[in-house]
Amino acid sequence: MRIRPGESHDRVAVSVYIDNCDPDDAKDVLDRMRLSTRQVKNTVRVHTDEPVRDTSYWKWVRESTAQLYIDLKLPPKTDADIRTPAGEIDADGIQGAIVIDAAACPIHVSNLSGSLKITAQGEPVSVHDFDGDLLDIRSTASTIDVARAVSSVVNLSSAAGTIEARSIQAVLNLDAHGSPVTLADIDGSIHGDLNASPLTLHGVPSSEVNLNAVGSPIEASVEPSFGADVQLEGRPVELDPSLTFRGEREPERVIGRLNNGGSGLKIRAVPGSVRCVRGGGV
């Protein structure tokens, strides 16, 4: 399913395309899929009636190379609730409050402004170039990839998947269970609860960082000039000796200041290791 802004300010346009087959076979594909479109008030449904699953149908499924695409053209500014049980969602250039709920369906969103809530399962989710009030992604067994997002709040929740977020300007909230997390260039505070989810942080956070982990190692890679009030707890704790630090060092606890201090950098991993190492820069 491809979702794009349309020219009409009060209508949704639905188009169906058949690719990777001869033109003469396209009608046969539509007949077998029994595709129909229906609108009830503000709800547009594109669905297939249950096909006759006889021997010829399954033979056709095995041998057919046809691909079906559904294009939705939304009004330039609109609120939409998009649900699909399968396929793929590709949304680009839309504005409004958007909700996407999909299982076993890759989701790719780019150049969206407004708010975006995604619930996904089992397939990749990517959101690039977002600008709005809220970005909320909740997934199971999925990879989450967020890049270049400006928002008041970004919430990322994953179970048995992965999270990668870079170039984010927002308050970032993380909830990860069995999901490795990689963060880079976060302009905003970071709050996270991690369970069996290793986390790696690159760059210099501009606001406080508060991370709590159970059974997960955490590594923060910071520039030598980075200033913060730090509190690190883990088994063990490693603070790069090349970083300028004043305070108390113990095998399982470090409290003090990096350079002249600054926002809070609080990392706790029980059980788990905590490493604060020198990254790039001078």
Give the location of each predicted region.
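Intrinsically disordered, low-complexity terminal regions
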Residues: 1-282
